[in-house]
Amino acid sequence: MTKRTKKVGITGKFGVRYGSSLRRQTKKLEVQQHAKYDCSFCGKRTVQRGATGIWNCKSCKKTVAGGAYTVSTAAAATVRSTIRRLRELAEA
């Protein structure tokens, strides 16, 4: 086997096309997209992206809606904390 790419990673398929900064942005997204994530139900690192915004756990077969490239987004975390705060205010 020959030595593979070190810097460009998954964006090596683009060659010299599209510019380095665009390839760098694409690399960041594609690495997040193809990574495995922890399942919030069973706790195993088996959640993979099925389609845009759909994440499937291979272990417990749960399907979760999330972000396009990651399971949870910053906006989703903000919404969760806001809902939690409003719920606490309503109970008090």
Swiss-Prot record:
Binding site for Zn(2+): 39, 42, 57, 60
Keyword entries, A-Z: Cytoplasm, Ribonucleoprotein, Ribosomal protein, Zinc
GO biological process: translation
Gene3D superfamilies: 2.20.25.30
InterPro entries per record: Ribosomal_eL37/eL43, Ribosomal_eL43, Ribosomal_protein_eL43, Ribosomal_zn-bd
Cofactor needs: Zn(2+)
Pfam families noted in UniProt: Ribosomal_L37ae
The protein's role, per its UniProt record: Component of the ribosome, a large ribonucleoprotein complex responsible for the synthesis of proteins in the cell. The small ribosomal subunit (SSU) binds messenger RNAs (mRNAs) and translates the encoded message by selecting cognate aminoacyl-transfer RNA (tRNA) molecules. The large subunit (LSU) contains the ribosomal catalytic site termed the peptidyl transferase center (PTC), which catalyzes the formation of peptide bonds, thereby polymerizing the amino acids delivered by tRNAs into a polypeptide chain.
The protein, known as: Large ribosomal subunit protein eL43
Species this protein is from: Candida albicans (strain SC5314 / ATCC MYA-2876) (Yeast)
